[in-house]
Amino acid sequence: MNFLLLVLSCFFTFNLRAETAVYFTPSNACENNIIQLLNNAEQQIDIAVYSITNKNITNAIKDAHKRGVKIRILTDKTQASNKSAKASELYKAGLNIKVHTKHRIEHNKFVVVDGKAVMTGSYNWTSSATLKNSENCLKIWNDDKTVSDYQKRFEYLWEVNSKEKSDLWFELKAIKDMAKR
């Protein structure tokens, strides 16, 4: 009986250890691992990101949306108005996206997938971050507390930023973009 308890305690201890992986740029490591997380999502993706201009990541987000994954995106309003930003494209594709209006800057860079994994770090979701910048990202899984902390932070940020203000912001941006043509 004691032997069985020892074996079971080793099994549960082993499976409860947090796992992490660190990636650095310039290289495709951060981009590829974010895309892999998005592609493996089954239920929910929550993204808080300063800037998103990377076409490959944008396509992975849209693909997850098409698979029926619930997606919420919070991004910086100044960065979202950048001509190469993908925020308007994602908004037009029907994704639930808010521009950050509560604090001066939305400078987070994290994604929570299915309440099981987090990717965070300095990595902006841009081609420059992938190919030119010195950036990092950290993938965390099998760590319920850390993932829960990130999920709670996302929930707070989501609640304090108005969907109505975000919708109005995207509508005004569309009008400004049309006027420039």
List each language-model region with its residue ranges.
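Structural recognition of the beta-strand scaffold that forms the well-ordered cores
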Residues: 46-48, 72-75, 98-99, 111-112, ...
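Primarily the HKD phosphodiesterase
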Residues: 36-95
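Solvent-exposed loop/turn segments at secondary-structure junctions
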Residues: 51-55, 77-81, 103-105, 117-118, ...
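Signature of lipid phosphatidyltransferase scaffolds
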Residues: 117-181
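Boundary/entry segment of secreted carbohydrate-active catalytic domains
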Residues: 19-29
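Extracellular/periplasmic catalytic domains that process cell-envelope and extracellular macromolecules
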Residues: 39, 90-91, 104-105, 111-114, ...
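Bacterial N-terminal signal peptides
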Residues: 5-13
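Sec/Tat signal peptide C-region and signal peptidase I cleavage site
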Residues: 14-18
